[in-house]
Structures are given as structure tokens and as C-alpha cells.
UniProtKB/Swiss-Prot annotation:
Segments of skewed composition (Basic and acidic residues): 181-191
Protein name: Small ribosomal subunit protein bS6
Key word Ribosomal protein present: yes
Annotated InterPro entries: Ribosomal_bS6 (IPR000529), Ribosomal_bS6_sf (IPR035980), Ribosomal_S6_plastid/chlpt (IPR020814), Transl_elong_EF1B/ribsomal_bS6 (IPR014717)
Biological source species: Mycoplasmoides gallisepticum (strain R(low / passage 15 / clone 2)) (Mycoplasma gallisepticum)
An example molecular function term from Gene Ontology annotations: rRNA binding
Key words of the record: Ribonucleoprotein, Ribosomal protein, RNA-binding, rRNA-binding
Keyword Ribonucleoprotein attributed: yes
Region (Disordered): 168-191
Purpose of the protein: Binds together with bS18 to 16S ribosomal RNA.
Length: 191
């Protein structure tokens, strides 16, 4: 016995009572099994299926054996007024298996609590700050070019930072070696 979720799409040319009758005929395969059913309404399809543009959607949730589900699928595929059928074994899905694992549930609760703390801090302060760190991580790991840009922006007194004083250097231009001095050295070596 396994838990299944079945999505059934019945032709939109039928009215709601006829579509419900088709669904009831197919559900008879499961016998006295407890089935939770949701009628999701008649919706327009994104693309035509079997030359139909609308369909009635039904969701079924049940616990059954594989043989009954296979028979349900066989009967649904025979009927011409059933457009599509999707059967999911929810016990094989990772979300269901994770919800049954105590360690994963505890970890998820811990992560959710941390997320709630962060969102609360963002709503109160307008920003999130890691506990124990007053500096911006970009400034903390800043290279020479970034430090120079901060000095231009804030002046010599950077807020709450201890950055060594840099001499004014053009950081955008890379120094190129002087070719004439290299040629002189080669000539001297050859002579």
C-alpha cells in the first residue's frame, strides 16, 4: 500500500455532471478505498490536447496498491473523453521522504528560525548585519583599487576602518617596460 496523487483531465465538451460521472466510473476501480477528491474546475488549456481547448480538472488523493492504480491508468487511457492522466507515488517523492526523516525536519526548523530572525532584523532596521561584524565585507577584503576609491569618496578618515595609508597611484594604467632599455641590454650582451 502506497500513497498516490492522481490528476485527471476530462474533456471540456462535457458538462460538469458528465465529467463527474466519468471520474466516478474510474474511481470504482479502487472499491472501498478512502479517496479525497478535489474538483479544480474547468480551465482553458495552454495548447490543444486531442483537438480540445478546455478540460475539467480532478485531483485524487488515496492509499492503494500498485495493481489497482495500474488498472485505473489502463481504463483511463481507453476512454476517449479523458485527455490526460498523471499518477504520482508521493512516497517516492523526495519531499515526502524528507518529511518522515527526523533529522531533516529538525534541520528545516532550525533554518526556518534563522530565516525568520533575518527577516525580522531587515524589517526593523532596513538591512541585515551579521552578528559580531561591524565592517562591510567588501571593505574588509578590499584590494588597493577599492581602498583608493573609498579614500576618494570619504576622504582620509574612513568610517570605522583601519586601512594603511596609500600613496596616490594611477591604478587604472599598468606600467609597461621600456623597450629601448631592453634593446640596449641585448646589444651589450651580444658585444
Amino acid at each position: 500500500m502506497a500513497k498516490y496523487e492522481i490528476m485527471l483531465m476530462v474533456s471540456g465538451q462535457l458538462n460538469q455532471n458528465q465529467a463527474q460521472a466519468v471520474n466516478d466510473e474510474l474511481k470504482a476501480v479502487f472499491g472501498k478505498t478512502e479517496i479525497t477528491e478535489e474538483y479544480l474546475g474547468q480551465k482553458t488549456l495552454e495548447y490543444p490536447i486531442k483537438k480540445e481547448v478546455t478540460a475539467h480538472y480532478f485531483n485524487l488523493f488515496l492509499t492503494s496498491d500498485g495493481k489497482s492504480v495500474h488498472e485505473y491508468k489502463r481504463l483511463a487511457s481507453i476512454r476517449t473523453d479523458v485527455l490526460r492522466i498523471l499518477i504520482l507515488n508521493t512516497e517516492k517523492e523526495f519531499g515526502y521522504r524528507a518529511s518522515q526523516n527526523a533529522k531533516k525536519v529538525a534541520l528545516a526548523k532550525q533554518k526556518q528560525a534563522r530565516y525568520n530572525d533575518i527577516m525580522k532584523q531587515v524589517q526593523e532596521n532596513g538591512y541585515f548585519q551579521i552578528k559580531g561584524s561591524k565592517r562591510n565585507s567588501r571593505v574588509e577584503k578590499a584590494g588597493a583599487k577599492e581602498v583608493w576609491m573609498l579614500r576618494e569618496k570619504f576622504g582620509e578618515d574612513l568610517p570605522e576602518q583601519k586601512i594603511p595609508v596609500l600613496r596616490k597611484v594611477n591604478l587604472t594604467r599598468k606600467p609597461t617596460p621600456n623597450k629601448s632599455s631592453e634593446n640596449k641590454q641585448k646589444v651589450e650582451k651580444q658585444a
